[in-house]
Amino acid sequence: METESTGTPTGETRLALVRRARRIDRILAETYPYAVAELDFETPFELLVATVLSAQTTDVRVNAATPALFARFPDAHAMAAATEPELQELVRSTGFYRNKASAILRLSQELVGRHDGEVPARLEDLVALPGVGRKTAFVVLGNAFGQPGITVDTHFGRLARRLGFTDETDPGKGRARRGRPVPPARDWTMLSHRLIFHGRRVCHARRPACGRCPIARWCPSYAAGETDPERARALLAYELKPGREELLELLRAGRTAGAAGPRPRAGGXAPGLPAQPFR
């Protein structure tokens, strides 16, 4: 619980929390240099639609469905003229396809009617769109426009609590907590990617692989899961999504996501987005 004297959930001083968070981010950046947006996209519109489709499913399933979807309806103008049955068939594999087809149709129509078919680059405009909440808006702002934003999904929220960055269980309240965020705003997007990636691979909800965690030394929740290194190894569940191996090789060679250049349906980092951990 956050205290009046320290202002942090762990009871450590604010300065100690900031230093620990910086160390954690540096280690995660070194461990996962390829942690970027997992949804494939080429335009802000594609990312917006893909993020809406990602609800209650995996990014892998969305990435399998979107090439055909965007080949037929490449922008808001084209999708706004689609019928719901057409969209339902194309997004069926993502689950809840009737609701999702309706959502992306209304979203496209609103973009055409209010923004001339362009995705707005302001938070207040994004959240005013049908089916777009703050999480989706921050994904788009951070990855399509290079504007800082923390993507609070289930992985990020779980890790933020385990690491003692917050004690809130409600993501909406977590944004409004007293005091300034631990990382500076410019680093929010990349920190989100790293924590989400770490949550998928190591820090699982039910049984985290503590014995294989690169930040175990700085985690106040160490021993919440399996601490034996060999047994923890068997729990590691995530490495790279299919098709990202070439990016890993480039990054290991010292090149950034931007240096890799565009590739078909690539998410990657937005132009100008910092690839280094905050300091």
Swiss-Prot record:
<dbReference type="InterPro" id="IPR004036">
    <property type="entry name" value="Endonuclease-III-like_CS2"/>
</dbReference>
<keyword id="KW-0479">Metal-binding</keyword>
<keyword id="KW-1159">RNA suppression of termination</keyword>
<dbReference type="Pfam" id="PF00633">
    <property type="entry name" value="HHH"/>
</dbReference>
<dbReference type="InterPro" id="IPR000445">
    <property type="entry name" value="HhH_motif"/>
</dbReference>
<dbReference type="GO" id="GO:0003677">
    <property type="term" value="F:DNA binding"/>
</dbReference>
<dbReference type="GO" id="GO:0003906">
    <property type="term" value="F:DNA-(apurinic or apyrimidinic site) endonuclease activity"/>
</dbReference>
<keyword id="KW-0227">DNA damage</keyword>
<keyword id="KW-0326">Glycosidase</keyword>
<feature type="binding site">
    <location>
        <position position="219"/>
    </location>
    <ligand>
        <name>[4Fe-4S] cluster</name>
    </ligand>
</feature>
<keyword id="KW-0004">4Fe-4S</keyword>
<dbReference type="InterPro" id="IPR023170">
    <property type="entry name" value="HhH_base_excis_C"/>
</dbReference>
<dbReference type="InterPro" id="IPR003265">
    <property type="entry name" value="HhH-GPD_domain"/>
</dbReference>
<keyword id="KW-0411">Iron-sulfur</keyword>
<dbReference type="InterPro" id="IPR004035">
    <property type="entry name" value="Endouclease-III_FeS-bd_BS"/>
</dbReference>
<dbReference type="GO" id="GO:0051539">
    <property type="term" value="F:4 iron, 4 sulfur cluster binding"/>
</dbReference>
<dbReference type="GO" id="GO:0019104">
    <property type="term" value="F:DNA N-glycosylase activity"/>
</dbReference>
<dbReference type="GO" id="GO:0006285">
    <property type="term" value="P:base-excision repair, AP site formation"/>
</dbReference>
<feature type="binding site">
    <location>
        <position position="213"/>
    </location>
    <ligand>
        <name>[4Fe-4S] cluster</name>
    </ligand>
</feature>
<feature type="binding site">
    <location>
        <position position="203"/>
    </location>
    <ligand>
        <name>[4Fe-4S] cluster</name>
    </ligand>
</feature>
<dbReference type="InterPro" id="IPR005759">
    <property type="entry name" value="Nth"/>
</dbReference>
<dbReference type="GO" id="GO:0046872">
    <property type="term" value="F:metal ion binding"/>
</dbReference>
<protein>
    <recommendedName>
        <fullName>Ultraviolet N-glycosylase/AP lyase</fullName>
    </recommendedName>
</protein>
<feature type="region of interest" description="Disordered">
    <location>
        <begin position="256"/>
        <end position="279"/>
    </location>
</feature>
<feature type="domain" description="HhH">
    <location>
        <begin position="123"/>
        <end position="142"/>
    </location>
</feature>
<keyword id="KW-0378">Hydrolase</keyword>
<dbReference type="InterPro" id="IPR011257">
    <property type="entry name" value="DNA_glycosylase"/>
</dbReference>
<dbReference type="InterPro" id="IPR003651">
    <property type="entry name" value="Endonuclease3_FeS-loop_motif"/>
</dbReference>
<keyword id="KW-0234">DNA repair</keyword>
<comment type="function">
    <text>DNA repair enzyme that has both DNA N-glycosylase activity and AP-lyase activity. Initiates repair at cis-syn pyrimidine dimers. Proceeds via an imino enzyme:DNA intermediate.</text>
</comment>
<dbReference type="GO" id="GO:0004519">
    <property type="term" value="F:endonuclease activity"/>
</dbReference>
<keyword id="KW-0408">Iron</keyword>
<keyword id="KW-0255">Endonuclease</keyword>
<comment type="similarity">
    <text>Belongs to the Nth/MutY family.</text>
</comment>
<keyword id="KW-0540">Nuclease</keyword>
<dbReference type="Pfam" id="PF10576">
    <property type="entry name" value="EndIII_4Fe-2S"/>
</dbReference>
<dbReference type="Pfam" id="PF00730">
    <property type="entry name" value="HhH-GPD"/>
</dbReference>
<feature type="binding site">
    <location>
        <position position="210"/>
    </location>
    <ligand>
        <name>[4Fe-4S] cluster</name>
    </ligand>
</feature>
